[in-house]
């Protein structure tokens, strides 16, 4: 069984039951309520999805995200564009809406600018492409009004801790959180999803390897080495009397994050870290970023680093590290790289020519030496004959 730390499945089922009783989504027009429910039904079954996306039903995480953002957009379209039917929107209307949202003309309830406009754009684009496919099946043609929508966006800020700060933070934690923090930093595991699904049986007998199972991973299963926290883990398991099928860590993610935030603020204040986020906003997931920064200069190959973190694309490396903590490690020995293959081949060719010349010279000398020895031998024989004759 896979642990669902945020209860996405329960939340989805509870919401569906509520809507079935009401018949519509509250505070939405009937047209928008019906089209959103139809879209969600297809996504729950994996029907009418993009040919480029993965096949099958969408996860409960995805379903909850679609539901939340589409209902939000529906209400905003009604308030700002005065439309009760999203399927009748024009290209100019949606482009104007999302530009205003990105530029802060359309504000949040607290008066601040939306930081994740691209997330709403992506949701709407996916919805519209679904609507185009459904209409096409019905023999109708729907124009793609999302072509010019900007789905780019600013990368979310996060909390960066360097190695010294990690050590200070780790030493200030209680035993339970000390183990969690070092485990997060060592493995770079996704928290809380992958983290809370780790069992004692996923650790090797010497606590130096971790198996992140396929069914608990967002991308793919992997077996990685524990280079920092193995001894700490061993003591933690022994002290808590954990058995093989026990989950390694049991805690409430929100409680854990509150603990980390309070401790970070106490140790480092409320200023901004190098990655832009305040220290007081530290969460478990920030240690995945910090872990990437730590391992990036230590891994010899990019593919090995991607494997450790469960990534398929190389751009994730920069996304998570932003090259923080990197340093210039070039040395004089590395200058050998500047010697081209051709130059090396030329040098090798010259060495081979010299070797052949030396071999020829040695062969000539051996021939000459043999001839000299032959003359010496003959001369010695003559001397012996002369001596015998004189006697």
Segments from the language model and where they lie:
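Short, polar N-cap/turn motifs at the start of nucleic acid-interacting alpha helices
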Residues: 204-205, 280-281, 300-321
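Long, amphipathic, Lys/Arg-enriched alpha-helical "connector/arm" segment
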Residues: 103, 108, 149-176, 198, ...
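Catalytic-site neighborhood detector that most strongly recognizes the C-terminal catalytic loop/helix
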Residues: 216-218, 309-346
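Short, charged phosphate-coordinating catalytic segments
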Residues: 134-136, 184-207, 303-304
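Basic, Lys/Arg- and aromatic-enriched nucleic-acid-binding interface segment
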Residues: 163-192, 288
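N-terminal core-binding DNA-recognition domain of tyrosine recombinases/integrases
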Residues: 37-156, 188
């Amino acid at each position: 069984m896979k642990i669902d730390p945020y209860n996405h499945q329960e939340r989805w089922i509870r919401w569906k039951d509520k809507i079935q009783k009401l018949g519509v989504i509250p505070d939405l027009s009937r047209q928008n309520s019906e089209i959103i429910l139809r879209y969600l039904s297809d996504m729950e079954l994996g029907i009418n999805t993009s040919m480029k996306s993965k096949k099958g039903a969408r996860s409960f995480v995805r379903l909850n995200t679609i539901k939340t953002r589409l209902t939000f957009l529906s209400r905003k379209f009604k308030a700002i564009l005065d439309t009760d039917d999203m399927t009748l929107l024009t290209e100019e209307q949606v482009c104007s809406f999302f530009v205003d949202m990105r530029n802060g003309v359309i504000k949040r309830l607290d008066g601040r600018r939306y930081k994740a406009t691209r997330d709403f754009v992506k949701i709407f684009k996916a919805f519209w492409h679904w609507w185009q496919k459904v209409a096409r099946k019905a023999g109708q043609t729907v124009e793609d009004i999302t072509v010019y929508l900007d789905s780019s966006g600013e990368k979310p800020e996060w909390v960066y801790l360097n190695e010294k700060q990690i050590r200070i933070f780790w030493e200030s934690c209680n035993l339970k959180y000390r183990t969690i923090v070092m485990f997060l930093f060592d493995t770079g595991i996704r928290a809380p999803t992958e983290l809370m699904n780790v069992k004692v049986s996923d650790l090797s007998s010497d606590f130096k390897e971790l198996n992140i199972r396929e069914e608990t991973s967002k991308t793919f299963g992997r077996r990685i080495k524990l280079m920092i926290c193995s001894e700490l883990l061993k003591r933690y398991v022994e002290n808590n009397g954990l058995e093989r099928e026990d989950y390694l860590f049991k805690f409430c993610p929100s409680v854990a994050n509150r603990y980390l935030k309070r401790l970070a603020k106490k140790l480092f204040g409320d200023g901004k870290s190098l990655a832009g986020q305040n220290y007081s906003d530290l969460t478990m997931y920030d240690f995945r970023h910090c872990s990437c920064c730590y391992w990036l200069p230590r891994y010899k190959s990019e593919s090995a680093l991607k494997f450790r973190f469960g990534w398929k694309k190389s751009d994730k490396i920069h996304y998570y590290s932003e090259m923080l903590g990197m340093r210039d490690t070039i040395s004089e020995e590395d200058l050998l790289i500047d010697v081209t293959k051709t130059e090396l081949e030329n040098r090798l060719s010259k060495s081979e020519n010299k070797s052949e010349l030396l071999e020829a010279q040695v062969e000539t000398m051996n021939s000459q030496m043999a001839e000299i020895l032959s003359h010496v031998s003959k001369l010695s024989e003559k001397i012996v004959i002369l001596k015998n004759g004189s006697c």
